[in-house]
Swiss-Prot record:
It comes from the Bacteria. InterPro entries: Flagellin (IPR001492), Flagellin_C (IPR046358), Flagellin_C_sub2 (IPR042187), Flagellin_hook_IN_motif (IPR010810), Flagellin_N (IPR001029). It is found in: Secreted; Bacterial flagellum. The gene is flaB. Flagellin is the subunit protein which polymerizes to form the filaments of bacterial flagella. Belongs to the bacterial flagellin family. Keywords: Bacterial flagellum, Secreted. The keyword Secreted applies. It holds the Pfam family Flagellin_IN. GO terms for cellular component: bacterial-type flagellum; extracellular region. Heteromer of flaA and flaB. The keyword Secreted applies. It comes from Campylobacter jejuni. This is Flagellin B.
Length: 575
């Protein structure tokens, strides 16, 4: 071998290898101390880019999980508040049910209504004060609120919480048909009851026979109420226009084909003769008689079949001749406030025909709290007992007054100049002649009895306090009447359904959020695992590398030492 001093090739090789080993040893120490395989872009440029993207995704998913939990917190807050509102509505319905029986007096019903008013105030208080981070939840403003629940923009879940104030819930549809005076066979169909389909009911006969009439139709409708959402009630009542005065029925006097015969009765039916005679056959006729609080004769069909008076009931009963054959009024209730669409054949036989005047109104929970408007009251069926009437079919007032049953025919004692005042018996009765259509009926000022230029013959003072031109009057608030209590029950039931629907929507969104959170939690774990695979160091493998480069570093130092020692052999040649 040659001996050279200027260039120590062995030492240079040993140094070069030692530099490489030292660099790798530094990297290994850096990885072992940081726990990361990639500490700089130089370690793995593409791997670093992927790992950084995965780290960003994992962090964003973590915040998305927090967003979802915030959303669940908001919805749970609203849900718990509505749970309290539902308890309030349950109490309102219970109190309305308590008021819906004639064992209650006006005083006790007024007390119940006061309780209901307070409950409604608390219901509205909950709706107006429930909030989360300053945002009102139950006021109707929490609509289409978005929550980011993904790693990329616009990956959101929307949540809406409906308004729960008493003015926004409980919207119930009431429709009551005209009073029926002619029977017949009826085919009744509900149109688009679920938004798509029609529901066709069995044919029903409207008559005075057992198993017929509005009662039979209401029963048929109510069988499917859970499916259609429409319930029916009926009122078949014939009421005298004035307090009973002494008189007598004719020999052929009959109700629903059952002969009762001649009965003499006193003022106010003081001897009970008229009521007793009618009630003696009530199991056969289905018609029950009573004297109301104003002393008027009231005939009621409990089963809902018609009331047909034949023969002569007597002038003292003051039965409107138009009411001698009466099949009542049908009332429909729907718990969503939408129109009740019907079709069929012979609908005029149930008061819902094309030419019939149908009273209809949609009423919210809050509206049931105050005085019930006359038109709303009529739609609810308040006027089913003939409290106000249009007397038609007579060419003149005198023709009506001389008709059978009017109480003003010859010998009645109510002739001109008799000095007898019977206006109180007709406070809510309107007589109209020569009026070809409803538009010819005019409202008049209080007490005037006439309207300017109407060219109508009118009698019995038309009082504005009586309500509208059909003789329907405003009714007192809420449960202070039996009909009102029934209506509040319907409205409270609708309100409960409304809140249940809102809560159900909230619940479905909560479930959606929870499933999403579970999913993105798993995704976050997998993303972090993928990042770890790329970025984190494998300590077992790196420990082996460290041992390798540590040994190489030591051996490199030894090799450099030996390479330098070899050069000293040249000195021996110079000795």
């Amino acid at each position: 071998m040659g001996f050279r001093i200027n260039t120590n090739i062995g030492a240079l090789n040993a140094h070069a290898n030692s530099v490489v080993n030292a660099r790798e040893l530094d990297k290994s120490l850096s990885r072992l101390s940081s726990g990361l395989r990639i500490n700089s872009a130089a370690d793995d440029a593409s791997g670093m880019a992927i790992a950084d993207s995965l780290r960003s995704q994992a962090a964003t998913l973590g915040q998305a999980i927090n967003n979802g939990n915030d959303a669940i917190g908001i919805l749970q807050t609203a849900d718990k508040a509505m749970d309290e509102q539902l308890k309030i509505l349950d109490t309102i319905k219970t109190k309305a049910t308590q008021a819906a029986q004639d064992g209650q007096s006006l005083k006790t019903r007024t007390m119940l209504q006061a309780d209901i008013n307070r409950l409604m105030e608390e219901l509205d208080n909950i709706a107006n004060t429930t909030s989360f981070n300053g945002k009102q939840l139950l006021s109707g403003n929490f609509i289409n609120q978005e929550f980011q629940i993904g790693a990329s923009s616009n990956q959101t879940i929307k949540a809406t919480i409906g308004a729960t104030q008493s003015s926004k819930i409980g919207l119930t549809r009431f429709e009551t048909g005209s009073r029926i005076s002619v029977g017949g066979e009826v085919q009744f169909t509900l149109k688009n009851y679920n938004g798509i389909d029609d529901f066709k009911f069995q044919k029903v006969v409207i008559s005075t026979s057992v198993g017929t009439g509005l009662g039979a139709l209401a029963e048929e409708i109510n069988k499917s109420a859970d499916q259609t959402g429409v319930r029916a009630t009926f009122t078949v009542e014939t009421r005298g226009m004035g307090a009973v005065r002494a008189g007598a029925t004719s020999e052929d006097f009959a109700i629903n084909g059952v002969k009762i015969g001649q009965i003499e009765y006193k003022d106010g039916d003081a001897n009970g003769a008229l009521v007793s005679a009618i009630n003696s056959v009530k199991d056969t006729t289905g018609v029950e008689a009573s004297i109301d609080e104003n002393g008027k004769l009231l005939l009621t069909s409990r089963e809902g079949r018609g009331i047909k008076i034949e023969g002569n009931i007597g002038r003292g009963a003051f039965i409107n001749p138009n009411m001698l054959e009466n099949y009542g009024r049908l009332s429909l209730v729907k718990n969503d406030g939408k129109d009740i669409l019907i079709s069929g054949t012979n609908l005029s036989a149930i008061g819902f025909g094309t030419g019939n005047m149908i009273s209809q109104a949609s009423v919210s929970l809050r509206e049931s709290k105050g005085q019930i408007d006359a038109n709303v009251a009529d739609a609810m069926g308040f006027n089913s007992a003939n409290k106000g009437n249009i007397l038609g079919g007579y060419s003149s007032v005198s023709a009506y007054m001389s008709s059978t049953g009017s109480g003003f025919s010859s010998g009645s004692g109510f002739s001109v100049g008799s000095g007898k005042n019977y206006s109180t018996g007709f406070a809510n009765t309107i007589a109209i002649s020569a009026a070809s259509q409803l538009s010819a009926v005019y409202n008049v000022s209080a007490g005037s009895g006439f309207s300017s230029g109407s060219n109508l013959s009118q009698f019995a003072t038309m009082k504005t306090s009586a309500g509208n031109t059909l003789g329907v009057k405003d009714e007192t608030a809420g449960v202070t009447t039996l009909k009102g209590a029934m209506a509040v029950m319907d409205i409270a039931e609708t309100a409960i359904t409304n809140l249940d629907q809102i809560r159900a929507d909230i619940g479905s969104v909560q479930n959606q959020l929870q499933v999403t959170i579970n999913n993105i939690t798993v995704t976050q774990v997998n993303v972090k695992a993928a990042e770890s695979t790329i970025r984190d160091v494998d300590f077992a493998a790196e420990s082996a590398n460290f041992s390798k480069y540590n040994i190489l570093a030591q051996s490199g130092s030894y090799a450099m030492s030996q390479a330098n020692a070899v050069q000293q052999n040249v000195l021996k040649l110079l000795q």
